[in-house]
Amino acid sequence: MIWCLRLTVLSLIISQGADGRRKPEVVSVVGRAGESAVLGCDLLPPAGHPPLHVIEWLRFGFLLPIFIQFGLYSPRIDPDYVGRVRLQTGASLQIEGLRVEDQGWYECRVLFLDQHSPEQDFANGSWVHLTVNSPPQFQETPPLVLEVKELEAVTLRCVARGSPQPYVTWKFRGQDLGKGQGQVQVQNGTLWIRRVERGSAGDYTCQASSSEGSITHATQLLVLGPPVIVVPPSNSTVNSSQDVSLACRAEAYPANLTYSWFQDGVNVFHISRLQSRVRILVDGSLWLQATQPDDAGHYTCVPSNGFLHPPSASAYLTVLYPAQVTVMPPETPLPTGMRGVIRCPVRANPPLLFVTWTKDGQALQLDKFPGWSLGPEGSLIIALGNENALGEYSCTPYNSLGTAGPSPVTQVLLKAPPAFIDQPKEEYFQEVGRELLIPCSARGDPPPIVSWAKVGRGLQGQAQVDSNNSLVLRPLTKEAQGRWECSASNAVARVTTSTNVYVLGTSPHVVTNVSVVPLPKGANVSWEPGFDGGYLQRFSVWYTPLAKRPDRAHHDWVSLAVPIGATHLLVPGLQAHAQYQFSVLAQNKLGSGPFSEIVLSIPEGLPTTPAAPGLPPTEIPPPLSPPRGLVAVRTPRGVLLHWDPPELIPGRLDGYILEGRQGSQGWEILDQGVAGTEIQLLVPGLIKDVLYEFRLVAFADSYVSDPSNVANISTSGLEVYPSRTQLPGLLPQPVLAGVVGGVCFLGVAVLVSILAACLMNRRRAARRHRKRLRQDPPLIFSPRGKSGSHSAPGSGSPDSVTKFKLQGSPVPSLRQSLLWGEPARPPSPHPDSPLGRGPLPLEPICRGPDGRFVMGPTVAPSQEKLCLERSEPRTSAKRLAQSFDCSSSSPSGVPQPLCITDISPVGQPLAAVPSPLPGPGPLLQYLSLPFFREMNVDGDWPPLEEPTPAPPPDFMDSQPCPTSSFLPPPDSPPANLRAVLPGTLMGVGVSSEPPYTALADWTLRERVLPGLLSAAPRGSLTSQSSGRGSASFLRPPSTAPSAGGSYLSPAPGDTSSWASGPERWPRREHVVTVSKRRNTSVDENYEWDSEFPGDMELLETWHPGLASSRTHPELEPELGVKTPEESCLLNPTHAAGPEARCAALREEFLAFRRRRDATRARLPAYQQSISYPEQATLL
């Protein structure tokens, strides 16, 4: 801003000069501070009275003029100039009491009031520059006294001003510091001490000088810190009982010093024998009165002023006294039969000169006791402890100051020395990691103390001593090998024994005593082997030359194998007068041991013969230069290296050494026997896809050249030897091999798991198949005719359920049979089965006259067919009702009597088989529907798949049963009653008509059966048994109306169905509750419940229904028919009650099963591999 104003003023001056009115003048006025100065202005006319005008004085940098005078009025003066300015001789301004602040630019202006031209209103004078000279003055100075902690930094700053500007300098203790040096630096009047020390304390003077004068300022720097010992104590010697003074003086700031004295590290006031005889003076000196021999030692002075780490100074005090005995024991034991010593505890200063002994009050004469002598410290040595040594002894020591007197008497006693009871063996061999116990025990008087120690290096933390003083090494480590010493000591003597421990199963131990004998261009290395660790060890000698020049790196170590059993090796081919390092390494099958210590050696040169003196050589033989122009070329055989021989060869070239490396790895010697005459070399055995670097080193005589230039080449795409690829960017080969092995193992494991799973599934399927084969042969329900009976409304009993085991269907396609009515084809017989030549019929089983199960005679096919034709009218309605009558739990109709023609699995001879098996009846087709697939109670239902042809059952007999009654005949003829029963089965035969579907059968049953079972609500084929062993399953939907739903039938309103498509039966939402069902089972634990109404109950309820049954014209032909099957179930033998009848039935059936099993055992078993879902087995 000031420069801008100055430029403005100059521009105004220049512009005014350009106007031509008056040329401005610049005047400089110099004054001293406190004096006066006149600033001239000649704008007024020199003579006459000037016109009316106004005088103004302006100062550059001020907004208003500092002085304004108009006529005779009082001037207007700036407050800073009040009382110090006035006009003199016209318009000149006089300033009194000049100040430094008055220095600057001033301008004089005069305004003439009679001028009418605006351009001539003002007459400006020249600018005047006022300079005020003043002596130097300090604007900033450091304090007079400054305290600074030791080792801290401090800054002393002096700032002065004046006109002209003064120059500031610093002085320390009267000496000019200049620019400073070391820790002290001076710059622009500022003194900076980086690290204050004790010597930095003192007076620092700041001086500001100029032409107007000089001024100074002094600062005292005080360094706060621990004291500094100025006068330390010195070593002193004093006779016993004299006083002594040890000086100690220190300086410090602050000066609140406290002195402390210590003897051998203990405060003198804490030592009881010194408390009353010691004083510490004001100046820090130690005063010790009446010194004693125990007062000798190191004394330390420690001054302190509260700062940390106070200094200290020490001195040694020597006290002279005559020789004296310290403490003589009252008894001295000596070992019997061993060497003993009677000691005389002496102290003396000056040193001891001699000791005299007395025995039993008489002077001891050593020449009378052979083997007795005096030791260097005056002890009495007895070679053999016996009765001659017994007695009372006293000693008197002497030095240059005399003696303090004889010692007290000591009584010599004979004691038994320690003796080992259990000594360790000379050596122990034990495997590493196991436990080793070495015994050692001793006895003596007094009992000795047994201790163990390892000779040489100690073994801390691994060796323990048990309660029996035995050494326990647990676990045994390699470091435990060595010599161990067991010592037993008591007050009489100390005895020792030792043993060697060898640890087996470790790497070799380090070799020792390695020595190298230099030879011409070689060296002979020898050593002493260490323990081999229990295995054969081999040695190798390692050596390397030291670098001749510091800028060259060390060569790699070279190893030479040592023949087995040798402990020395001759290392040839070394450079003479070159320093080598040698080391020996031992190895065995477990690994390498540590290297031995490194030994340096310099091989000698070849012996030379004296040569004739000649002229001194003018040139030094040229050194060996490196090979030149090394290049690498790819060829089909590998990598070919080509080079030129060295340019400088001192003599004959011995050969080359080829070195190579992969990428940035270390250099390796590839071939060290390249002949010196070769200029090219084929390098086989390289790795694919790797960048190689090669170089050559030449050697001749004792010279080894520097490496040649480096030749780079890549083996990418080159077939080399051996052909393998390395992946340096991915994984190392060991890691890669491990990864590949792990992947292969995982694949094999997965494959084995899959095979095991398949094998287990096959075994599980085989076990299920064998389980089915071991089960009882199925009881086949063979329909003998067509059922065309009427039914009456009623409720069926849910208390009895007949179990079905669904088996494989002989029909190739049940769906096709049901939809199109195609006749079922018999299954293809197994080619290896004896049944392949024809079906094997089943024998009928029925009751005999005595009520036992017996085999009945077979019925001829013609008779069966005739029976079937007579019992079944050939109407479409009868065809639709061909399915077997299976009543559900709902009252769909009167259940029809069931005729089991033959439940025996015992087959007739093959020659007796008259005809093939009949085709599957409507009941079997009905049971093969998907609804009955869900009713499997044994868990063996096969999956829904296309049935394959399978061999037929072992035997199925179609002969009607002979008549056998369970109950006594009723009053009315049973034949008539049985004749009127609808649905009586006449026989089994193969019909030429197509089979009826289950849908037609169910529709006919709904129309015919409801009127027949109004008074006979017995259990049906699908009702549940009251026995706890029975299993429930789903049934077809009920056809009887009911208000509630059954737990075995779908709920009302349910839109789901148990059949679908063409197999769907008409749905009827009729169910009965469980609470309305009757229990008709003779035993709740017996599962052979009756599937039909009881005989007595049927006879009682049948008479009212006879008349009503006549109303059905379609049943007239069946009323007078009497078939052999009717006697199978409708003529039971009378029993006293349900329990007795059930027990009798069970016993009879078990007897039948035993006979059947015996018969089956004599027949070949047929392996049925596929079950038929359209056959039902009654359990």
From Swiss-Prot:
- Name its cellular compartments: Cell membrane; Synapse
Signal peptide bounds: 1-20
Q: Where is the composition biased (Polar residues)?
A: 1020-1029
* MF (Gene Ontology): cell-cell adhesion mediator activity
Question: Which Pfam families does the entry link to?
Answer: fn3, I-set, Ig_3
Q: Where is this region: Disordered?
A: 767-807, 819-842, 942-974, 1016-1079
Q: Which GO terms describe its cellular component?
A: axon; dendrite; glutamatergic synapse; inhibitory synapse; postsynaptic density membrane
Q: Which residues lie on this side of the membrane: Extracellular?
A: 21-734
Q: Topology relative to the membrane, per the entry?
A: Single-pass type I membrane protein
User: Keyword Cell membrane on this protein?
Assistant: yes
Task: Please give the subunit comment from the record.
Answer: Interacts with MAGI2 and SHANK1.
Q: Which PANTHER family match?
A: CTX-RELATED TYPE I TRANSMEMBRANE PROTEIN, PROTEIN TURTLE HOMOLOG A
Role summary: Functions in dendrite outgrowth and synapse maturation.
Record-given protein name: Protein turtle homolog A
Lineage of producing organism: Eukaryota, Metazoa, Chordata, Craniata, Vertebrata
